[in-house]
Amino acid sequence: MALKHKDLLSIHDLEIGEVALILDVAAKLKRKQKNGEPHQYLKGKTLAMLFSKASTRTRTSFEVGFFQLGGHPIYLSDDASQIGRGEPVKDTARVLSRFVDGIMIRTFSHDSVVELAKYASIPVINGLTDLLHPCQALTDLFTIQEKMKVLKGRKMVYVGDGNNMAHSLMYAAAKVGMNMVCACPKGYQPDPHVLAEAQEDASHTGCTITVEEDVMKAVKGADVLYTDTWASMGQEEEHDARKKIFAPYQINAELLAAARPEAIVMHCLPAYRGEEITDDVIEGPQSVVFDQAENRLHVQKAIMALLMRDEVL
C-alpha cells in the first residue's frame, strides 16, 4: 500500500488509514535499524533537500535516513542554488524533476511549497514552512503511540504560540481521534482556517480540537503536554515582547502537576530552557523529548519510502 497523493504537504491531506500506515511502517523500519537488518528500499534513488531555514534535526534526520534507505541525498541551501537568487519555483520544480527522484523542502512560505509540488512530477515533502510542520507532528504521534500504546481518546495540550507546530498537531490529533487543546494567549492563537479544518477532521473521528486562554484549565487531565519556542525563525525582533506575553504559558513543575500523573512532556526542539520550558521538566522523568527527536529519523524514512518506492513495503 502506498500513499494516495504523490506529496506530503499537510497531514490534513492524508486519509485516516494513511496516518496509521506511516506509523506502522515507521515502527518496522525502526526495528530493522535497531536490529541491523538491511532496509535499502530506496537504493539508487536521489533526494534533493532544499533549505531556506537553518536546521539541525531536519537536515540530519532526512540526510541520514535517506542514506540508510540506500539513496543519495543532495543538500541545496538558498545561497548555493538559483532558487535563492530568484529563479521561479515552478522552474526549479520542473528541472529537479528531471534530475532526482524526490524533493524535501524546508522554507518560509507555504505557498512556495504548494507551487513546487504543483509543478514537480516527483514527490515533494514539506520539511517545514511557516504554516505547517507535518513530519514533526507525525513523529509526535509515533512517539505518543510508543509510550502510551493507544492514541484515540488521549488528551494532548499544546502550550504556547499557535504556530506551525500547533497547526500540524491539530491536524494530526484530529486524524487519530485525540482530543487537543491549544492553550495560547489572545492574539497568538492558531490560524482560524486551520482550526476549522482540524475540527472538521475531528468530527469524523469523535474527538475535539479547541483553543483555551486559561492554561491551568487547559492542562487538567492532560496525557501529553507539548510546547515549542515562543519566537520562531524570522520573529527574533519580537523575542523580548513575546517573553512577557508568554510567561504564564511556561511548562514548569507547577503546570505539569496539574496534568495526569503519568503525563508525558514533549518539545520539538530547539528548546530555550527557562523560557517555554524549565530545565527540571525537560530533564525530568516525564520528558520524552529526546526519544521524540530520534523518532524523526524513523518516521521520515517511512514517509520517504512510502512516497518514493513503487513496491509494497
Regions flagged by a language model, labelled:
Residues 69, 99, 119-120, 176, ...:
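Short, structured coil segments at secondary-structure junctions
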Residues 199-279:
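Rossmann-like adenosine-cofactor binding region
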Residues 1-14:
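Generic N-terminal amphipathic, Lys/Arg-enriched alpha-helix
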Residues 52-64, 148-227:
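Glycine-rich phosphate/diphosphate-binding loop of Rossmann-like nucleotide-binding domains
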Residues 34-36, 40-145, 273:
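Phosphate/diphosphate ligand-binding glycine-rich loop within oxidoreductases
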Residues 42-47, 152-154, 262:
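Phosphate-coordination loops involved in phosphoryl transfer and adenosine-cofactor binding
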Residues 262-263, 268-313:
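Adenosine-phosphate binding glycine-rich loop
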